């Protein structure tokens, strides 16, 4: 069993499964997309030399029968699948709960069949499926201070304490390498905040000073790369503050060890990593 939902650019959703108005006949394009392999052929030698490879765009084709009243249900489809406009497709089965963004390429209707059939083609420039529920991982941890037996003094006692870790394993539960969203909130003065991937040696260093309350937001995902500073309610781009040679982090599937530091004030850095797992197919 599976669930298929379409969301249009206005945030309106239409479930195509478990819906008496439509009967899905087939969905093509849910498997891993075709790879394009670039090679060079050398004169006089058999075979070729591998140069590079990339995944093709994804095309999803949904074929469904339109149940009665056909006119009403067909026109309702047009609200969610508008040619050239964006649409988000949600797909859930027993092991995946994912979405993918695309654009409606064509909605073809067999108007004069006894039962009308719609074939909807969606073009997805980014071919990977994304987890619906992003995994938010805090560099800080909570140390439990509540033990039995106990007595509470007049001044009170703490039940737990937040420990600001400077190194932590950040997990990517997807099948593919993916970018990451990182937020760093300063609780005091931080000079030149730094983030390191311990295993790969990649680093990202910002040549700037943060004041208490400042928030740095980093996004290393394909198509969304950005570094911004939110200070006193105003958000500005600070990509220009990246030190030369800084890397845009990419997380391998599984555990990725990260550490945070600064020239001074590292203890005032509260870092949170948000990972959206990606998959080739469902």
Region roles according to the model:
Residues 65-107, 257-259:
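Short, acidic/charged, Gly/Pro-enriched secondary-structure junctions
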Residues 73-81, 117-119, 134-139:
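"Short basic amphipathic alpha-helical interaction patches in structured regions
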Residues 45-68, 114-128, 256:
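Oligomerization/assembly interface segments of phage tail-like spikes and tubes
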Residues 90-132:
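Short beta-strand and beta-hairpin "edge-sheet" elements
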Residues 1-57, 97-108:
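Solvent-exposed edge beta-strands and adjacent loop segments
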Residues 30-33, 114-125, 214-231:
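Short, surface-exposed secondary-structure junctions/capping segments
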Residues 42, 55-59, 84, 115-117, ...:
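A general secondary-structure signal for short beta-strands and their flanking turns/coil
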Residues 137-282:
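Intrinsically disordered, low-complexity segments enriched in serine, threonine, and glycine
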């Amino acid at each position: 069993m599976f669930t298929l939902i379409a969301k249009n650019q206005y945030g309106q959703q239409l479930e195509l499964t478990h819906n008496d108005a439509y009967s899905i006949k087939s969905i093509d394009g849910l498997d891993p997309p075709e790879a394009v392999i670039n090679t060079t052929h050398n004169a006089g030698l058999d075979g070729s030399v591998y140069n590079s490879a990339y995944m093709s765009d994804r095309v999803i084709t949904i074929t469904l029968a339109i149940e009665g009243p056909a006119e009403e249900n067909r026109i309702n489809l047009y609200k969610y699948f508008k040619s050239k406009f964006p649409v988000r497709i949600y797909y859930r089965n027993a092991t995946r709960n994912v979405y993918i963004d695309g654009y409606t390429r064509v909605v073809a209707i067999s108007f004069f069949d006894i039962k009308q059939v719609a074939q909807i083609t969606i073009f997805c420039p980014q071919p990977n499926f994304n987890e619906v529920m992003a995994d938010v991982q805090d560099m800080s941890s909570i140390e439990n201070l509540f033990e039995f037996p106990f007595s509470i003094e007049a001044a009170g006692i703490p039940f737990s304490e937040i420990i600001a870790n400077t190194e932590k394993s950040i997990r990517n539960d997807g099948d593919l390498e993916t970018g990451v969203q990182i937020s760093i909130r300063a609780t005091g003065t931080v000079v030149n905040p730094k983030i390191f991937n311990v295993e790969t040696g990649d680093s990202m260093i910002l040549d700037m000073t943060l004041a208490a309350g400042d928030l740095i937001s980093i996004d290393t995902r394909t198509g969304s790369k950005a570094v911004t500073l939110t200070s006193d309610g105003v958000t500005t781009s600070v990509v220009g503050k990246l030190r030369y040679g800084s890397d845009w982090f990419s997380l391998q599937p599984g555990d990725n060890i990260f550490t945070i530091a600064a020239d001074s004030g590292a203890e005032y850095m509260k870092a949170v990593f948000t990972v959206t797992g990606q998959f080739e197919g469902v």
